[in-house]
Amino acid sequence: MATVTVNTLEFVSALRALIPISKQATLYSGEKERNAATIAARITPAKKLALITGNSALGAIASVGIEQAVEAGEREFCLYTDDAKNITSIFKPNKQNSEEPLRLEFGNQLDNENIMIAETHKAYGNTELIVGNLAEDAEITDTLLNDLYLSVNNPEAPESPSFNVIKVAAFTTASKIYGEAATRVTGSDAGRIRHLIYGTHLHGVIALDRGMEDSEVATLVSEARNTVLETMGNRA
């Protein structure tokens, strides 16, 4: 699995360089490299394209790479973004040319944009959405997730699509994260969840739980940066 840390100007080059070469590429922007490095360190490697973006510009850049991957037959995407509005435009009905679900995993904290995403994809047919989140108030989070589920699984809606929302995690305190996660993964959804997806603010929780110091987190970031620079240099 290639772990890539790049700044905004390098992001397009990294996408174009890695997407055709490997189906196991994790790409994320330098804007949130501390967050992304620690998240990447915990994600189970999987054959999917993962993107972490931090603003509209990066979202637009990432959408270009995703659209190319969809056209190439990719069906699974793990999206980490604080501004996902640009992502939604590229999953168009004419891209739904397979009976296999298009799996979309959103790793940011659930908000109104995510609900908008769900409403947008509701019209796109055979789609599966996995929402992962870290919330201070689990009750509020559950309400949002339930509303989201109902909005995309309304049996009375005309031509209701196959659109499943899997609630991955809603935690009252950060200290419960791994116990709760383990319970959920070994539960009824275990066969459907490839790996856990959490929010962009999770890096502090991971660092605390793993006993990592800031210097260790910085080392992860440095190693990731060196990896992509070396990789891109070898493939230039």
Report residues per predicted region.
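DNA polymerase processivity clamps
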Residues: 1-236
